C-alpha cells in the first residue's frame, strides 16, 4: 500500500522534563499520521474513527531540534477496519525512534454505525512491508 509522510520539527514546547520529545506530543502526531493514511485510502475522512492504539514503542530518545518523519501505511484490512503501521524516524540520520500500530473503523457519518469500506490490500512492495503486515497479524491474533 502507499506510504504517507508527515514531517515535524521538534521544538522546546514539544519536550518533556528530560529534554526529549514528550510522549503526549508524539501520540498526537502519531495518531494524526495514521489517520491521514486511513483517510486517504478510504477517501472520506469524515467516515474514519480511531478504534485502538496498539502501542507506540520508543526505540531511542528524540531531542530538541530533531526533524522527524512519520511514515504510515495501511497494513491490514477487515471488512470495516483498517490497521495502520507508523514509523517515526530521524529525517537526517534515518534512525528509527518510534513505531506502532493503530486501528481505524469506517462509520456512517450520520449514525456512527460501522460500514464496509471495500479496501483490499495490494501485494507487499518489499520485505519491510511483509514484516509490517506480519506484525499486524500477530496483534490481531492476540486481540
Task: Say what each PLM segment does.
Residues 1-23, 127-143:
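Catalytic strand-loop segment that frames the active site of acyl-thioester-processing enzymes
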Amino acid at each position: 500500500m502507499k506510504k504517507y509522510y508527515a514531517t515535524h520539527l521538534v521544538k522546546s514546547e514539544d519536550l518533556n522534563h528530560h529534554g526529549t520529545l514528550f510522549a503526549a506530543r508524539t501520540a498526537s502526531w502519531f495518531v494524526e499520521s495514521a489517520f491521514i493514511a486511513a483517510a486517504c485510502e478510504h477517501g472520506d475522512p469524515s467516515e474514519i474513527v480511531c478504534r485502538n492504539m496498539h502501542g507506540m514503542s520508543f526505540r531511542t530518545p528524540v531531542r530538541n531540534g530533531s526533524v522527524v518523519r512519520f511514515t504510515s501505511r495501511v497494513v491490514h484490512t477487515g471488512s470495516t477496519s483498517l490497521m495502520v503501521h507508523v514509523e517515526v524516524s530521524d529525517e537526517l540520520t534515518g534512525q528509527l525512534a518510534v513505531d506502532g500500530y493503530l486501528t481505524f473503523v469506517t462509520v456512517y457519518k450520520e449514525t456512527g454505525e460501522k460500514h464496509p469500506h471495500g479496501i483490499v490490500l495490494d501485494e507487499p512492495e518489499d520485505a519491510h512491508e511483509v514484516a509490517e503486515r506480519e506484525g499486524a497479524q500477530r496483534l490481531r491474533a492476540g486481540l
